[in-house]
Amino acid sequence: MNQTIKVKKKKKTITLGVVHIRASFNNTIVTFTDIQGNTISSASAGSNGFKGARKATPYAAQVTIDRASEKAKEYGLKTISIRIGGPGAQRESAMRALFGQNFVVTSILDVSSIAHNGVRPPKRRRV
Protein backbone atom coordinates (compact mmCIF):
# COMPACT_ATOMS: atom_id res chain seq x y z
CA MET A 1 0.00 0.00 0.00
CA ASN A 2 1.50 3.31 -1.10
CA GLN A 3 1.19 6.25 1.21
CA THR A 4 1.51 9.79 0.02
CA ILE A 5 2.86 12.46 2.27
CA LYS A 6 1.34 15.87 1.79
CA VAL A 7 3.75 18.73 2.30
CA LYS A 8 2.15 22.04 3.10
CA LYS A 9 3.38 24.72 0.72
CA LYS A 10 4.81 27.74 2.52
CA LYS A 11 3.30 31.06 1.51
CA LYS A 12 5.84 33.72 0.69
CA THR A 13 5.56 37.00 2.53
CA ILE A 14 5.26 40.15 0.47
CA THR A 15 5.40 43.48 2.30
CA LEU A 16 5.31 45.92 -0.64
CA GLY A 17 2.70 45.69 -3.39
CA VAL A 18 0.61 47.47 -5.99
CA VAL A 19 -3.19 47.66 -6.12
CA HIS A 20 -4.69 47.92 -9.59
CA ILE A 21 -8.30 49.16 -9.58
CA ARG A 22 -10.22 49.12 -12.86
CA ALA A 23 -13.55 50.92 -12.50
CA SER A 24 -15.52 50.61 -15.73
CA PHE A 25 -19.11 51.63 -16.34
CA ASN A 26 -20.24 48.03 -15.79
CA ASN A 27 -17.89 46.42 -13.25
CA THR A 28 -15.02 46.94 -10.80
CA ILE A 29 -11.92 44.74 -10.95
CA VAL A 30 -9.31 44.86 -8.15
CA THR A 31 -5.92 43.12 -8.40
CA PHE A 32 -3.19 43.06 -5.75
CA THR A 33 0.25 42.42 -7.24
CA ASP A 34 3.84 42.48 -6.08
CA ILE A 35 6.35 44.95 -7.52
CA GLN A 36 7.16 42.70 -10.49
CA GLY A 37 3.46 42.43 -11.42
CA ASN A 38 2.79 38.89 -10.20
CA THR A 39 -0.79 38.58 -8.96
CA ILE A 40 -1.31 38.05 -5.22
CA SER A 41 -5.09 38.26 -5.14
CA SER A 42 -7.85 39.40 -7.43
CA ALA A 43 -11.59 40.07 -7.16
CA SER A 44 -14.36 41.69 -9.12
CA ALA A 45 -17.87 42.84 -8.34
CA GLY A 46 -19.23 40.02 -10.50
CA SER A 47 -17.23 37.38 -8.62
CA ASN A 48 -18.67 38.67 -5.33
CA GLY A 49 -22.24 37.88 -6.32
CA PHE A 50 -23.34 41.19 -7.82
CA LYS A 51 -25.18 40.92 -11.13
CA GLY A 52 -26.33 43.38 -13.74
CA ALA A 53 -26.41 47.07 -12.90
CA ARG A 54 -25.53 46.43 -9.23
CA LYS A 55 -21.95 45.56 -10.27
CA ALA A 56 -21.36 49.23 -11.11
CA THR A 57 -22.40 50.56 -7.68
CA PRO A 58 -19.98 52.07 -5.14
CA TYR A 59 -21.07 49.48 -2.56
CA ALA A 60 -20.05 46.64 -4.89
CA ALA A 61 -16.62 48.27 -5.26
CA GLN A 62 -16.29 48.49 -1.48
CA VAL A 63 -17.13 44.80 -1.01
CA THR A 64 -14.71 43.87 -3.79
CA ILE A 65 -11.85 45.79 -2.13
CA ASP A 66 -12.62 44.12 1.21
CA ARG A 67 -12.52 40.59 -0.25
CA ALA A 68 -9.35 41.14 -2.27
CA SER A 69 -7.51 42.79 0.62
CA GLU A 70 -8.39 39.92 2.99
CA LYS A 71 -6.57 37.52 0.66
CA ALA A 72 -3.64 39.93 0.23
CA LYS A 73 -3.18 40.34 3.98
CA GLU A 74 -2.62 36.58 4.27
CA TYR A 75 0.63 37.17 2.35
CA GLY A 76 1.72 39.86 4.82
CA LEU A 77 1.09 42.82 2.55
CA LYS A 78 1.41 46.09 4.47
CA THR A 79 2.58 48.84 2.11
CA ILE A 80 0.82 49.52 -1.19
CA SER A 81 0.79 51.95 -4.07
CA ILE A 82 -2.52 52.46 -5.84
CA ARG A 83 -3.05 52.55 -9.62
CA ILE A 84 -6.64 53.44 -10.44
CA GLY A 85 -8.10 53.59 -13.91
CA GLY A 86 -11.38 53.78 -15.73
CA PRO A 87 -14.33 56.15 -15.96
CA GLY A 88 -16.59 54.49 -13.39
CA ALA A 89 -18.38 56.14 -10.49
CA GLN A 90 -16.94 53.56 -8.06
CA ARG A 91 -13.45 55.07 -7.97
CA GLU A 92 -13.97 57.21 -4.87
CA SER A 93 -15.59 54.50 -2.75
CA ALA A 94 -12.91 52.00 -3.78
CA MET A 95 -10.23 54.39 -2.54
CA ARG A 96 -12.06 54.99 0.74
CA ALA A 97 -12.41 51.24 1.26
CA LEU A 98 -8.65 50.81 0.75
CA PHE A 99 -7.84 53.52 3.28
CA GLY A 100 -10.06 51.70 5.80
CA GLN A 101 -8.01 48.49 5.46
CA ASN A 102 -5.00 49.91 7.39
CA PHE A 103 -2.51 49.72 4.53
CA VAL A 104 0.35 52.22 4.29
CA VAL A 105 -0.27 54.02 0.98
CA THR A 106 2.88 55.34 -0.69
CA SER A 107 1.44 56.72 -3.94
CA ILE A 108 -1.78 57.09 -5.90
CA LEU A 109 -1.61 57.09 -9.70
CA ASP A 110 -4.42 57.69 -12.17
CA VAL A 111 -3.74 55.43 -15.16
CA SER A 112 -6.97 56.10 -17.07
CA SER A 113 -6.42 55.97 -20.79
CA ILE A 114 -7.40 59.14 -22.60
CA ALA A 115 -8.24 58.89 -26.30
CA HIS A 116 -6.36 61.26 -28.60
CA ASN A 117 -8.92 61.12 -31.44
CA GLY A 118 -8.69 57.36 -31.88
CA VAL A 119 -11.67 55.14 -32.63
CA ARG A 120 -15.07 56.67 -33.36
CA PRO A 121 -17.33 56.44 -30.27
CA PRO A 122 -20.61 54.52 -30.41
CA LYS A 123 -23.73 56.40 -31.48
CA ARG A 124 -25.78 58.16 -28.82
CA ARG A 125 -28.65 56.25 -27.19
CA ARG A 126 -32.21 57.21 -28.04
CA VAL A 127 -34.53 56.29 -25.20
UniProtKB/Swiss-Prot annotation:
<comment type="function">
    <text>Located on the platform of the 30S subunit, it bridges several disparate RNA helices of the 16S rRNA. Forms part of the Shine-Dalgarno cleft in the 70S ribosome.</text>
</comment>
<keyword id="KW-0699">rRNA-binding</keyword>
<comment type="similarity">
    <text>Belongs to the universal ribosomal protein uS11 family.</text>
</comment>
<dbReference type="InterPro" id="IPR018102">
    <property type="entry name" value="Ribosomal_uS11_CS"/>
</dbReference>
<comment type="subunit">
    <text>Part of the 30S ribosomal subunit. Interacts with proteins S7 and S18. Binds to IF-3.</text>
</comment>
<keyword id="KW-0694">RNA-binding</keyword>
<dbReference type="InterPro" id="IPR001971">
    <property type="entry name" value="Ribosomal_uS11"/>
</dbReference>
<dbReference type="Pfam" id="PF00411">
    <property type="entry name" value="Ribosomal_S11"/>
</dbReference>
<dbReference type="GO" id="GO:1990904">
    <property type="term" value="C:ribonucleoprotein complex"/>
</dbReference>
<dbReference type="GO" id="GO:0005840">
    <property type="term" value="C:ribosome"/>
</dbReference>
<dbReference type="InterPro" id="IPR036967">
    <property type="entry name" value="Ribosomal_uS11_sf"/>
</dbReference>
<dbReference type="GO" id="GO:0003735">
    <property type="term" value="F:structural constituent of ribosome"/>
</dbReference>
<dbReference type="GO" id="GO:0006412">
    <property type="term" value="P:translation"/>
</dbReference>
<keyword id="KW-0687">Ribonucleoprotein</keyword>
<protein>
    <recommendedName>
        <fullName>Small ribosomal subunit protein uS11</fullName>
    </recommendedName>
</protein>
<dbReference type="GO" id="GO:0019843">
    <property type="term" value="F:rRNA binding"/>
</dbReference>
<dbReference type="InterPro" id="IPR019981">
    <property type="entry name" value="Ribosomal_uS11_bac-type"/>
</dbReference>
<keyword id="KW-0689">Ribosomal protein</keyword>
